[in-house]
């Protein structure tokens, strides 16, 4: 399959197909998506060497991962985001590079990528509330898109993000509707912007019902299974334990489930658990009936859209910044139920 044949199959000109694959802004999103899907279905890939010579581009996109958040490499969200982005890169004839970086070396890595011309653009992962990478990359003149947002960064930049505040407000409201008032929040690292926004949503839902937040029921760490287990074990031993847990990660929610079981309690009966992000390529939340009630975000789609956004910026560096907010679905599973009339305390 070559460009001429692909264009004929789609009933489009070769110029339109080429511009769609290269992310040119004058091609509509519907046409661009149609062309990319056809390219994937037929196995068509542009010749990167020829395109690189013709355009002066590296035909590669960079993903720089800070070692301080290296747990992201084991996070199924990161894996599915990369999988979605890779579909767009493949259709457009781009390669992808992954670089691990220490915090002190991160700026040098970006400068090196820029100086060597190894990549044409960057996807920024795991933005912090205040993130110096955004003004740095802007000053460097490197096209980039942020997966997430940085609340304290005022300058305009391109990003794609979940409505984390809305998702966690809805999740907490669902638990409040079930009669829960002692709702624990097991969040991500407090410096991460997504965790900040999720806590805002949680607090907003409590405030709307006149429920005062208890600092003893709010915790933020790296979202691992042991973290979920330890936090839930400690909270269940409180004099007035939580009757529900709102958890920022399915992996941590699995740890919460283990703590509930070890305490001799039943998830969904004695204690409710509501997780965020529950359906991944290699980690599934049950089959016909989800085990966990969860807010489900379109992670793979976010990867595709972020890659398309970046390719448009590479094709036309003068474009104004683009932003996109995606919504989460509330999926009802077996892990939630009405609040018990009297919470069961677990001996410490």
Language-model region placement:
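N-terminal helix-turn-helix DNA-binding module of bacterial transcription factors
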Residues: 1-59, 347-348
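Hinge/beta->alpha junction and helix N-cap segments in small-molecule ligand-binding domains
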Residues: 67-80, 98-107, 160-170, 186-233, ...
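Short acidic/polar active-site loop segments enriched in Thr and Asp
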Residues: 13, 59, 120, 181-182, ...
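Alpha-helical recognition/docking segments in bacterial nutrient-uptake
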Residues: 60-64, 68-173, 177, 235-237, ...
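Flexible loop/turn connectors
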Residues: 233, 237-348
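Short acidic capping loops at alpha-helix termini that bridge into adjacent secondary structure
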Residues: 181-182, 213-217, 267-273
């Amino acid at each position: 399959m070559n460009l001429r044949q692909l264009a004929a199959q789609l009933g489009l000109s070769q110029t339109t197909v080429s511009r769609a694959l290269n992310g040119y802004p004058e091609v509509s999103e519907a046409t661009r998506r149609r062309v990319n899907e056809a390219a994937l279905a037929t196995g068509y890939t542009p010749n990167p060497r020829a395109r690189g010579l013709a355009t002066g581009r590296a035909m590669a996109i960079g993903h720089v991962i800070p070692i301080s958040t290296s747990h992201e490499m084991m996070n199924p969200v990161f894996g599915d985001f990369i999988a979605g982005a890779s579909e767009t890169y493949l259709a457009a004839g781009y390669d992808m590079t992954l670089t691990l970086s220490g915090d002190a070396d991160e700026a040098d890595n970006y400068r090196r990528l820029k100086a060597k011309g190894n990549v044409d653009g960057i996807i920024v992962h795991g933005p912090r509330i205040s993130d110096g990478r955004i003004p740095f990359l802007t000053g460097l003149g490197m096209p980039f898109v942020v997966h997430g947002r940085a609340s304290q960064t005022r300058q305009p930049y391109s990003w794609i993000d979940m409505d984390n505040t809305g998702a966690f407000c809805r999740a907490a409201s669902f638990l409040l509707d079930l009669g829960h008032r002692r709702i624990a929040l097991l969040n991500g690292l407090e410096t991460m912007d997504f965790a900040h926004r999720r806590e805002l949503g949680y607090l907003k839902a409590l405030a709307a019902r006149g429920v005062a937040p208890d600092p003893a029921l709010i915790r933020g760490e790296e979202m691992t299974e042991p973290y979920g287990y330890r936090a839930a074990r400690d909270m269940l031993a409180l004099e007035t334990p939580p009757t529900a847990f709102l958890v920022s990660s399915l992996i941590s929610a699995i740890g919460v489930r283990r703590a509930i079981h070890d305490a001799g309690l039943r998830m969904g009966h004695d204690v409710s658990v509501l997780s965020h992000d529950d359906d991944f390529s290699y980690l599934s939340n049950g089959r016909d009936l989800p085990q966990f009630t969860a807010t489900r975000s379109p992670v793979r789609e976010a990867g595709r859209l972020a890659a398309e956004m970046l390719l448009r910026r590479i094709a036309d560096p003068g474009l104004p910044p683009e932003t996109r907010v995606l919504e989460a679905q509330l999926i009802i599973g077996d892990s939630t139920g009405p609040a018990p009339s009297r919470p069961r305390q677990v001996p410490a």
